[in-house]
Amino acid sequence: MQVAGIDLAWGSRARTGVALTDEHGALLRSASVTTDEQIADFLSGNSPAVIAIDAPIIVTNASGMRECERDLSRDFRRFHAGTHPTNVSRPSMQPEPRAKRLVQAHGWGTDVELSPGPMSPVALEVYPHSSMVGLFGLDRVI
């Protein structure tokens, strides 16, 4: 089972990091890209079961933070690993989040109840800073 990671820039001018690992977590390849087409080219010929995206996928709140951002910030702010507020009034979320457009374009699911696989890949929104704090027992984000 391959896993793809996308450190998605919120706009298409900034650099986006992409990586692909095998079922054991070994890095198969990585790249720095800018456009959604380059992301598609990077993933072409591969079948990741899970796509971990460091960017908002589902944003429905008009202002402020999403509930998940509030919860995560409450728990990880003291480690300097809180989140930035995401809402539909932000220009970068118009007409919809870039990550959502990618998910829709590639036909990735977002329902965590599904069993991911090469034929039914699932995209997940991830927070690397808080993950590093939790996984490595850090006192502060790196």
Where are these predicted regions, by residue range?
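RNase H-like (RuvC/DEDD) metal-dependent nuclease/polynucleotide-processing core
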Residues: 1-4, 8-142
